[in-house]
């Protein structure tokens, strides 16, 4: 059971392996375990296989034609030379199906893997006393998920294949003819149009770049704005890449690195500061997810990171995928809270803007009333929230986000996986017991994570009195990077939550914030507030502060601490 390097903790798109057939630099080769590096006859590096790995399970699959393994666990084989194997057995009592990785040089169940180089898992019957025994092996990713029994699927039955090809060919001729005609017409149209525009493009190239720079003006070290709103949520469809010069590395995550960069303006020395998030080739899926989220024009909001464009680039290190966004010099919220103690006004501003950003993300319409696809972040934490120059928050890092498309089935939602950062996972995510019949349950997990971030803000607010050094949620109870099992013990078994000291409640405003975040991290998902309700509570706090004419005193909050809001 323990031979796979990865056994189903994350969905496949998060653990993509690139099949690189190029030479690894010598200094990298020296740092890699020799058991994990194998080369083929051409000297190219061979990486471990991705296979279904469920060991022995009962199965309803018969030995007619083909069937799926129904194995939900994808494993990266322990050694590069291992291939995917499936074993089907039937005796008087039951049918079992076994899916594993195995070295073809070694016998398995006393049989040699004769077809290890095959791209498909075509079953062959083996002689075993007292049972019917079929086995197959193959060498393409997850090839042991679809197991084939019937000779109809093999080239050894040429007559049947000939009939199939003839029928298929005759059926495809009419639509194929139409498709070819459409392609020819479209090609002629594009060629004619491009000839007309070619001269205009050559003469206007510089002018267009100037217009782009003017509309996308980013104010350097200015408190007014980090980037103009006119350029948010664009995709660079031009073949010409933006003139960007990378400056310094400012952040590094699981999937990408973030650089401060200069967007040059024409041939002058002027430039605008932007952030460039660079994904390596093997993290294409994460880049595409985030790009698709940003591409929604209705996502645009003051508390969501403003997006310029997405690009594919070829470099000396290979193909890279770039996301170009506004740059915020104050960094992420975790870094900011580590370096700074905040006032009550700062807390109110940070908390309010965070709730507004999440509420917009979750909403099915824009502030203007246009229909919008609800989105859940699924990895909310203080390091995925940026602090703007005006001390408001904006959400970033949508690599694990999910669009709540009403056409998604329960199975589609179930396949979205247990994702996020363990420290910030809601109880139902840790326990894998989300209500997939109700898409609101995904939003409720974001609200739980938001509550932990609000607690982080409150713990660094000087309005509560003594302020301790920054500490993440559950900081003293778990290690620096806790695993899911460790968080289960704290959150599920012990029903633990971050501590709220009694002296915090001496400040009426802080008391209301604590009541709000306590309702947001309730163990029952349906009992939690919505992000919109939290935003409304912060708005009322701000309104009461303005009425009082003070910004930092608890007297600005009514003595009874009442707020009239609903969920």
From Swiss-Prot:
Its cofactor is Mg(2+); Mn(2+). Changing residue 526 to Q: In esophageal cancer. The modification Phosphoserine is found at residues 409, 548, 553. Pfam families: ecTbetaR2 (PF08917), PK_Tyr_Ser-Thr (PF07714). Homodimer. Heterohexamer; TGFB1, TGFB2 and TGFB3 homodimeric ligands assemble a functional receptor composed of two TGFBR1 and TGFBR2 heterodimers to form a ligand-receptor heterohexamer. The respective affinity of TGFRB1 and TGFRB2 for the ligands may modulate the kinetics of assembly of the receptor and may explain the different biological activities of TGFB1, TGFB2 and TGFB3. Component of a complex composed of TSC22D1 (via N-terminus), TGFBR1 and TGFBR2; the interaction between TSC22D1 and TGFBR1 is inhibited by SMAD7 and promoted by TGFB1. Interacts with DAXX. Interacts with DYNLT4. This is TGF-beta receptor type-2. It is a single-pass type I membrane protein. The keyword Transmembrane applies. It is an enzyme of class 2 (transferase). The keyword Membrane applies. One of its GO terms (cellular component) is membrane. Residues 23-166 are extracellular. Belongs to the protein kinase superfamily. TKL Ser/Thr protein kinase family. TGFB receptor subfamily. It is linked to Hereditary non-polyposis colorectal cancer 6: An autosomal dominant disease associated with marked increase in cancer susceptibility. It is characterized by a familial predisposition to early-onset colorectal carcinoma (CRC) and extra-colonic tumors of the gastrointestinal, urological and female reproductive tracts. HNPCC is reported to be the most common form of inherited colorectal cancer in the Western world. Clinically, HNPCC is often divided into two subgroups. Transmembrane serine/threonine kinase forming with the TGF-beta type I serine/threonine kinase receptor, TGFBR1, the non-promiscuous receptor for the TGF-beta cytokines TGFB1, TGFB2 and TGFB3. Transduces the TGFB1, TGFB2 and TGFB3 signal from the cell surface to the cytoplasm and thus regulates a plethora of physiological and pathological processes including cell cycle arrest in epithelial and hematopoietic cells, control of mesenchymal cell proliferation and differentiation, wound healing, extracellular matrix production, immunosuppression and carcinogenesis. The gene is TGFBR2. Residues 244-544 form the Protein kinase domain. Phosphorylated on a Ser/Thr residue in the cytoplasmic domain. Glycans are attached at residues 70, 94, 154. Residues 188-567 are cytoplasmic. One of its GO terms (molecular function) is activin receptor activity, type I. The chain crosses the membrane at residues 167-187. It comes from Homo sapiens (Human). GO terms for biological process: activin receptor signaling pathway; aorta morphogenesis; aortic valve morphogenesis; apoptotic process; artery morphogenesis; atrioventricular valve morphogenesis; blood vessel development; brain development.
């Amino acid at each position: 059971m323990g031979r796979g390097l990865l056994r189903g903790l994350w969905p496949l798109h998060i653990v993509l392996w690139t099949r690189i057939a190029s030479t690894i630099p010598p200094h990298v080769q020296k740092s890699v375990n020799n058991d994990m590096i194998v080369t083929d006859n051409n000297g190219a590096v061979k990486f471990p296989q991705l296979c279904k790995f469920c060991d022995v399970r009962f199965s309803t699959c018969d030995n007619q034609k083909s069937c799926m393994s129904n194995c939900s666990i994808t494993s990266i084989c322990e050694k590069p030379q291992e291939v995917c194997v499936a074993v089907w057995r039937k005796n008087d009592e039951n049918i079992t199906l076994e899916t594993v990785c195995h070295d073809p040089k070694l016998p398995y169940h006393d049989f040699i893997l004769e077809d290890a180089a095959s791209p498909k898992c075509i079953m062959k019957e083996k002689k075993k006393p007292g049972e019917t025994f079929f086995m197959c092996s193959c060498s393409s990713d997850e090839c042991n998920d679809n197991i084939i029994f019937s000779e109809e699927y093999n080239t050894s039955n040429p007559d049947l294949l000939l009939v199939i090809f003839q029928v298929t060919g005759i059926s495809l001729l009419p639509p194929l003819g139409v498709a070819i005609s459409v392609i020819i017409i479209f090609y002629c149209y594009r060629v004619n149009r491009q000839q007309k525009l070619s001269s205009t493009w050559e003469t206007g190239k510089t002018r267009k770049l100037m217009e782009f720079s003017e509309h996308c003006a980013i104010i350097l070290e200015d408190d007014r704005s980090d980037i103009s709103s006119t350029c948010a949520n664009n995709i660079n469809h031009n073949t010409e890449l933006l003139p960007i010069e990378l400056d310094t590395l400012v952040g590094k995550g699981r999937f990408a690195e973030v650089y401060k960069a200069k967007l040059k303006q024409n041939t002058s020395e002027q430039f605008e500061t932007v952030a460039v998030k660079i994904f390596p080739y093997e993290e294409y899926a994460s880049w595409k997810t985030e790009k698709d989220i940003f591409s929604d024009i209705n996502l645009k909001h003051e508390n969501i990171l403003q997006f310029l464009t997405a690009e594919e680039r070829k470099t000396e290190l290979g193909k890279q995928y770039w996301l170009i966004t506004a740059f915020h010099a104050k960094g992420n919220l975790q870094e900011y809270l580590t370096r700074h103690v905040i006032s009550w006004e700062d807390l109110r501003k940070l908390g309010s803007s965070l709730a507004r950003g999440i509420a917009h993300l979750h909403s099915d319409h824009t502030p203007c009333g246009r229909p919008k696809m609800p989105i859940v972040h699924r990895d909310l934490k203080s390091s995925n929230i940026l602090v703007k120059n005006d001390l408001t928050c904006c959400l970033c890092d949508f690599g694990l986000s999910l669009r709540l498309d009403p056409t998604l089935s329960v199975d589609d939602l179930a396949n979205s996986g247990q994702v996020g950062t363990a420290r910030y996972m809601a109880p139902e995510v840790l326990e894998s017991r989300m209500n997939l019949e109700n898409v609101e349950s995904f939003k409720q997990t974001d609200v739980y994570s938001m509550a932990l971030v609000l607690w982080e803000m409150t713990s660094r607010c000087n309005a509560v009195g003594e302020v301790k050094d920054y500490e993440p949620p559950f900081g003293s109870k778990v290690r620096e990077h806790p695993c899911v099992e460790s968080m289960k013990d704290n959150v599920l078994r012990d029903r633990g939550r971050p501590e709220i000291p009694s002296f915090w409640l001496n400040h009426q405003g802080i008391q209301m914030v604590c009541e709000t975040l306590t309702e947001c991290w309730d163990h029952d998902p349906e009992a939690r507030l919505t992000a919109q309700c939290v935003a409304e509570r912060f708005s009322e706090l701000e309104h009461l502060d303005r009425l009082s004419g003070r910004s930092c005193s608890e007297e600005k909050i009514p003595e009874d601490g009442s707020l009239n809001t609903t969920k």
